[in-house]
């Protein structure tokens, strides 16, 4: 049926690492789908979806510094034995750390979806509605196990990670982006005009939680199988934008071109009185190749345009999610002195913020 087209594809990638000792691998699964449907003569729908999952698994000791591992490995003697006479791994070989020093696992899921409708109810008028949604989830697990070397009498001593530990990190973000706009074009004689106007918004939220504990008790490295108090943390961040936009295009016989754009954007990153701003742009052009005096040269140069433009676009990106809030620095047990046998919590004065901060 010409009114309905669909497409589905999948992919699997399994990539082994470079290490002979200790698994070092990456696996990726992807699925993509698309549907185009002509619902009526004047209404068309398009739906796109894409999902991917990536799994990374590597020795936990590499997380302490992959560059350091390869740096040291390249500087050892190539004839260095890997085991001692008793069959134990030599610390200089790094094999014991790779095989028994813990694991680092990372799983990331990404789902992106897009739904759009295009309507042409009357000649020259096009109505567009787009909805974009993206979600990202990530989970990291790392554990560092104590590894040992052995002296000449076969007595063990700590080689790495004197205190075993578990670290876990969970992250999730959501992004939502609706776009609604209309276009109208009309020609009369050699005059051609096109007008476009619409609304756009972005909505972003993210959250993460971290936890770490020391002293793994069993062969199952989890937060519940440790002996110390947990060290936990987390954050929640968000921002939102909204904007109205419009554009006018005009040309005369395809020779003289003019375009004007105007945006009115607002961002949650600024105070209410500085949140909104106008951003105009203009351009004018001359298509010389459309002039009659250029016809003898058309076989040699069929396109030649002169164009001049000026415009502004706003930038809300900063290194601070909420730059207009004065925040107090806080550190748990950050003091360098003892009160009742324990380090106290500390706080610092907030930095200066600008009440006039706005779009760049």
Which ranges hold each PLM region?
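Acidic, glycine-rich flexible loop segments
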Residues: 13, 65-96
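Extracellular/periplasmic, surface-exposed regions of secreted and cell-surface proteins
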Residues: 34-43, 48-53, 89-144, 156-360
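Glycine- and other small-residue-rich loops at beta-strand/loop junctions that grip anionic moieties
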Residues: 62, 68, 358
């Amino acid at each position: 049926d010409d009114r309905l087209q669909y497409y589905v594809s999948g992919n699997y990638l399994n990539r082994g690492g470079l290490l002979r000792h200790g698994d070092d691998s990456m696996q990726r699964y992807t699925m993509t789908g698309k549907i185009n449907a002509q619902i009526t003569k004047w209404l068309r729908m398009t739906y796109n979806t894409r999902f991917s999952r990536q799994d990374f698994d590597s020795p936990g000791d590499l997380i302490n510094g992959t560059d350091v591992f390869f740096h040291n490995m390249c500087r050892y003697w190539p004839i260095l034995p890997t085991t001692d006479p008793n069959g134990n791994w030599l610390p200089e070989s790094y094999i014991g750390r790779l095989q028994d020093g813990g694991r680092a696992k990372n799983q990331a899921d990404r789902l992106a979806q897009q739904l759009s409708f295009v309507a042409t109810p009357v000649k020259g008028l096009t109505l567009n509605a787009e909805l974009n949604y993206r979600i990202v989830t990530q989970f990291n697990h790392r554990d560092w196990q104590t590894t040992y070397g052995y002296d000449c009498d076969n007595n063990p001593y700590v080689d790495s990670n004197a205190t075993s530990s578990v670290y876990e990190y969970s992250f999730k973000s959501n992004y939502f982006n609706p776009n609604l706009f209309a276009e109208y074009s009309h020609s009369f004689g050699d005059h051609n005009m096109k007008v476009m106007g619409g609304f756009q918004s972005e909505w972003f939220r993210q959250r993460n939680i971290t936890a770490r504990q020391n002293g793994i008790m069993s062969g199952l490295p989890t937060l519940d199988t440790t002996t110390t108090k947990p060290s936990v943390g987390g954050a929640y961040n968000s921002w939102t934008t909204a904007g109205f936009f419009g554009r006018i295009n005009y040309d005369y016989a395809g020779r003289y071109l003019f375009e004007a754009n105007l945006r009115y954007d607002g961002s949650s990153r600024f105070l209410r009185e500085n949140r909104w701003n106008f951003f105009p742009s203009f351009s004018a052009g001359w298509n010389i190749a459309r002039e009659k005096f250029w016809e003898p040269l058309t076989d040699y140069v069929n396109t030649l345009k002169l164009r001049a433009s000026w415009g502004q676009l706003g930038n809300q990106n900063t290194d601070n999610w909420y730059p207009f809030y004065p925040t107090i620095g806080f550190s748990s047990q950050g003091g360098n002195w003892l009160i009742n046998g324990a380090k106290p919590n500390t706080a610092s004065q907030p930095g200066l913020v600008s009440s006039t901060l706005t779009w760049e």
